[in-house]
């Protein structure tokens, strides 16, 4: 009887530890590097973005910092900040009731020449960039829908100010927590 209780207790504790690891970001092979409003950004999300820029630098004949160097950490952390911004956009869009579907993102990519019809999107950075652009367009339309002005130039200026104020508020009000060693610097 005591052995059975001990086994049950061990299973319960083990399940709790496993659940805790999964909720924190997937364990050691995919640690959480930041949280945006409670939503994790993981190492497996950050790595392809870093790889994208590493390949871009190579294609342009420019150096890319070596892994582990201080310069690499600065670049990596700036790229993480980009993922944080995109996550803030997705969360803000959801609160406003706007979205960008996978089909819309792929169509925009195909229209830009980044992907051929029927071709799989291989670069998650490009996909995320197009998704963010579509969301920003829809957020802008929603936030600026009631703005009026006597001229087109003044209308554009008023809309730009309203969108800037909205995005600044989103950034200010969204709680972002970076894991040690990942916070973007000045």
Q: Where would I find each of the regions flagged by the language model?
A:
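Basic side chains
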Residues: 4-5, 76, 86, 138, ...
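A ubiquitous, low-specificity "background" feature that marks scattered single residues
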Residues: 20-21, 110, 132-137
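Proteins with a high burden of low-complexity, intrinsically disordered sequence enriched in S/T/G/P/A and R
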Residues: 8, 115-119, 123, 150, ...
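N-terminal targeting/tethering segments
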Residues: 27-130
């Amino acid at each position: 009887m005591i052995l059975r209780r001990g086994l049950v207790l061990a299973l319960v504790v083990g399940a709790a530890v496993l659940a805790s690891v999964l909720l924190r970001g997937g364990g050691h092979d995919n640690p959480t590097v930041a949280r945006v409003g409670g939503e994790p950004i993981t190492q497996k999300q950050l790595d392809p973005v870093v790889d994208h820029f590493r390949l871009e630098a190579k294609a342009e004949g420019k150096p890319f910092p070596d892994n582990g160097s201080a310069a690499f950490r600065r670049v990596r952390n700036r790229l993480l900040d980009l993922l944080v911004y995109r996550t803030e956009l997705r969360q803000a869009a959801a609160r406003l009731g706007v979205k960008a579907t996978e089909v819309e993102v792929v169509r925009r990519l195909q229209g830009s020449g980044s992907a051929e019809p029927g071709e799989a999107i291989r670069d998650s950075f490009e996909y995320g960039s197009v998704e963010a652009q579509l969301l920003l367009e829809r957020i802008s339309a929603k936030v600026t829908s009631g703005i009026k002005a006597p001229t087109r130039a003044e209308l554009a200026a008023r809309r730009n100010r309203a969108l800037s104020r909205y995005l600044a508020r989103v950034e200010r009000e969204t709680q972002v927590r970076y894991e040690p060693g990942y916070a973007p610097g000045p």
